[in-house]
């Protein structure tokens, strides 16, 4: 089993800790944790971005992790970036409890997400259905509220 963790922070008050686990190569990755200080009763875009570089805040994390050159989509779509995890939903206190199982992510091999950045966005992901070029790249999810580099853990 491989485990990883990311501590989310940014220029906004949004914070969180997200864990990633994968039993074996080829198995789904479980993504879990809590993200706090988001807008209440909202859906916010949640993606793995290409780089583990946060030297210029979340902006330097680059675009969504997309090693296969596909358009942006929903987690259930065949046409999606590897890093497209959809939206996290917040409760009345602005807390999103994350519990995702994703078969496209990996903690093994050349497409591993370890060393990349997980980002929670300030807007809702439209799953590439927004009818414009930006939707096919980012899902129109907006600014990067918080992010963290995904690091191997024990």
UniProtKB/Swiss-Prot annotation:
Q: Which Pfam families match?
A: Sod_Cu
Which reaction is catalysed here? 2 superoxide + 2 H(+) = H2O2 + O2
Q: What is this protein called?
A: Superoxide dismutase [Cu-Zn]
Kindly state what the record says about how the cofactor is bound: Binds 1 copper ion per subunit. Binds 1 zinc ion per subunit.
Instruction: Specify where it is mainly localized.
Output: cytoplasm
Write down the EC number: 1.15.1.1
Protein residues bound to Cu cation: 47, 49, 64, 121
**Record: residues binding Zn(2+):** 64, 72, 81, 84
Name what cofactor the protein needs.
Answer: Cu cation; Zn(2+)
Cytoplasm as a keyword of this entry, yes or no, is yes
List the PANTHER family: SUPEROXIDE DISMUTASE CU-ZN -RELATED (PTHR10003)
Origin organism of this chain?
Cryptococcus gattii
InterPro entries in UniProt: SOD-like_Cu/Zn_dom_sf, SOD_Cu/Zn_/chaperone, SOD_Cu/Zn_BS, SOD_Cu_Zn_dom
For this protein, what is any one GO molecular function term?
Answer: superoxide dismutase activity
What does the UniProt function comment say about this protein? Answer: Destroys radicals which are normally produced within the cells and which are toxic to biological systems.
Query: Where found in the cell?
Result: Cytoplasm
The UniProt entry's sequence similarity note says: Belongs to the Cu-Zn superoxide dismutase family.
Q: Listed GO cellular component terms?
A: cytoplasm
Q: Which Cys-Cys disulphide bridges does the record give?
A: 58-147
Residues annotated for substrate binding in this entry: 144
Q: How does it assemble?
A: Homodimer.
Instruction: Write the record's keywords in alphabetical order, separated by commas.
Output: Antioxidant, Copper, Cytoplasm, Disulfide bond, Metal-binding, Oxidoreductase, Zinc
């Amino acid at each position: 089993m491989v485990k990883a963790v990311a501590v989310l922070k940014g220029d906004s008050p949004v914070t969180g800790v997200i864990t990633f686990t994968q039993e074996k190569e080829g198995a789904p990755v479980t993504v879990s944790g809590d993200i706090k200080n988001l807008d209440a009763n909202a859906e916010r875009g949640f993606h793995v971005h290409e780089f583990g570089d946060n030297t210029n805040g979340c902006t330097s994390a680059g675009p969504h992790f997309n090693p296969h050159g596909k358009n942006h989509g929903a987690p259930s779509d065949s046409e999606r970036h590897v890093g497209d995890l959809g939206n996290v939903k917040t409760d009345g206190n602005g807390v999103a409890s994350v519990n995702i199982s994703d078969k496209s992510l990996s903690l093994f091999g050349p497409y591993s997400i370890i060393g990349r950045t997980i980002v929670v966005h300030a807007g809702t992901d439209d799953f590439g259905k927004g009818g414009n070029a930006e939707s096919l790249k980012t899902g129109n999810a907006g600014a990067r509220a918080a992010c963290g580099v995904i690091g191997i853990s024990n």
